[in-house]
């Protein structure tokens, strides 16, 4: 029996980190809709999800954003931030850094107040050293 090697090439739409994405795929897993969650529980979960993304760049941006803004966000803004965290890590990173050539900004995020706040923080106008905030 002969073994044949087959080379598979995955197209990645210019994103070196993400697997190819098919928007029409029926295999999409919908985010969990949490009900009955207190504001404090939600904030604690969002802090955790902001810090434990798996990609250092996203961890730094999102954990600093959470530390700076979570306490002052309204309930609707917390919901919007929760929805943003359901997006893929590299997409959030590229949107936050306004690198739309790599990952175009979807229409659903074009008027996002939270994304605009995240983009402003990502500019780091104060030139702070980026590190994970203390818990």
UniProtKB/Swiss-Prot annotation:
The keyword Chaperone applies. InterPro entries: SDH, SDH_sf, SDHAF2. It comes from the Eukaryota. Its main location: mitochondrion. Keywords: Chaperone, Mitochondrion. It is found in: Mitochondrion matrix. This protein may be expected to contain an N-terminal transit peptide but none has been predicted. Plays an essential role in the assembly of succinate dehydrogenase (SDH), an enzyme complex (also referred to as respiratory complex II) that is a component of both the tricarboxylic acid (TCA) cycle and the mitochondrial electron transport chain, and which couples the oxidation of succinate to fumarate with the reduction of ubiquinone (coenzyme Q) to ubiquinol. Required for flavinylation (covalent attachment of FAD) of the flavoprotein subunit of the SDH catalytic dimer. This is Succinate dehydrogenase assembly factor 2, mitochondrial.
